[in-house]
Amino acid sequence: MNRARFAGAVAVALITSPASAEDLFDLKPVADGVYAALARPATPINCNAAVVVYDEGVLVVDTHSRPSSARGLIQQIRGVTDKPVRYAVNTHFHWDHAQGNHAYPVAFPKQVAIVASEATRENLKELGMQRVKDQLEAGPRQIAALKERIAAATDATARKAIEGELAQQEAYLAEIRSLELTLPDLTFDKSLILHRQDRDIVLLFLGRGHTSGDVVAYLPKQRVVATGDLLHGWMPFMGDSYPPEWVATLDALDKLDFDHIVGGHGGVKPKSHLRFFRDYLADLIEAVRAARARGETLDQAKTSVAAVLKPKFDAGMDGRFDGSVGANIEKVYRDLEAKKY
């Protein structure tokens, strides 16, 4: 599709699917038939999704934190196309990317496949429900803390905002009490190529990184990648990660020819963001190694390493550097302490 035709299609899509205050996502056209469903702020968070409309149907990358969020996106997709969702891809097993799986076979019975790497299916099978149980245990404490904040709030606007968070947290907890965790029913080892009439959709496992099973969806003709939390616009969560391998996996991703990144969080990014994100991880590992070589304790390393990284990376992390860098330093420090790499 030439640029003029694509611009016209975008205009039609925006006219036929206006955003509303109730929408959970902002659908942003990225390329011909490719949309970024950017998650609006919510408690708990949702991830972004990529929506690919092809000749016979729709492919969605990631299913969010709960079925109601997935249903919300399905409704928004119906404002763009009446084609059914044929594939829902889990980029990895984390709760905010896969707990909405069940909504898709309910909405599209016998029509949709849930797709993931073999490692992600195994992670969901082994760890998914335990993560749900962890959330059920933590939920009442989070609700109690929000109620304390409401009681202590002196500003009416702030109180109203916290009350909104409380309502969302209570609704989330009620929903996941009866959550059915639907496992992927189509898996692959290294790659799966969907040859559609109007495009190829290439699903790739390039190596371990954010988790042991991260999947990338690559659209070579449209020059777009959807990357989940392997690569996104926020500071990385590293709790289940393999840091040196993550750098190598991003180097492999860098070899693909694309212009646009639809990551699991934050906005749509240009390809240049890959190098920025990759360098953060590489510099983090190097700086923690140096701190340990100087004999620094973990607390000392948190201070010194953050000071090294902040000037280069703070501005590109969507205001989340200070809140996450300490946990990232601790992850690498503990891994090095355990001689994992």
PLM regions and their residue ranges:
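Active-site HxH/HxHxD metal-binding segment of metal-dependent hydrolases
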Residues: R78-P184, I193
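Bacterial N-terminal signal peptides
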Residues: A7-S17
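C-terminal regulatory/interaction regions
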Residues: A293-Y341
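Core dinuclear metal-dependent hydrolase active-site scaffold
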Residues: P29, R177-L183, T187-L219
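Active-site neighborhood of phospho(di)ester-bond hydrolases with catalytic His/Asp-centered motifs
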Residues: V61-T63, R86-H94, V115-E118, L206, ...
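Conserved beta-strand hairpin/beta-sheet module of binuclear metal-dependent hydrolase folds
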Residues: K28-G79, V215-D229
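Active-site-proximal loop/helix segments of hydrolase catalytic cores
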Residues: D200-L256
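Divalent-metal (often Zn2+) His-rich catalytic cores of metallo-beta-lactamase-fold enzymes
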Residues: P244-Q300, S304
